[in-house]
Amino acid sequence: MRLNTLSPAEGSKHASKRPGRGIGSGLGKTGGRGHKGQKSRSGGGVRRGFEGGQMPLYRRLPKFGFTSRKSMVTAEIRLSDLAHVEGDVVDLNTLKAANIVGIQTEFAKIMLSGEVKRAVTIRGLRVSKGARAAIEAAGGKIEE
């Protein structure tokens, strides 16, 4: 057996329909598009959300909410990321130096994901309950 002799089992593959290629194809002449009308034309059809001129649902319903600008400059940090920080004190500047958060970041919160292997002091960062328990269990402390 060679790669160039491999072929699928007889009858396991069906030839795809080729619209507009004659009466015998089952999709000849109009190619399954019917006669005339917008949807029969090339490039025809209406845009997403168009309801034939009726005021569409997305315009009938009111706008709501907004995206907080604070969320754009807030980062979530995993416990396992703390291993990449040099030194025993972790604050926003040491996280930026270790490339864990971006330069634009102004706030950060440490979440319980992974585990902390050594005692670290967290300074000026928010910490979730689970992460706080894990840090203190490893001998670390949190300074507000």
From Swiss-Prot:
Q: Name one GO cellular component term.
A: cytosolic large ribosomal subunit
Swiss-Prot/TrEMBL keywords: Ribonucleoprotein, Ribosomal protein, RNA-binding, rRNA-binding
Region (Disordered) residue ranges read 1-53
Which residues are listed as membrane-spanning? none
Can you provide one Gene Ontology molecular function annotated for this UniProt record? structural constituent of ribosome
GO BP terms, alphabetized:
translation
Q: What does this protein do?
A: Binds to the 23S rRNA.
The name under which this protein is listed is Large ribosomal subunit protein uL15
Q: Which organism is it from?
A: Sodalis glossinidius (strain morsitans)
Q: Which gene encodes it?
A: rplO
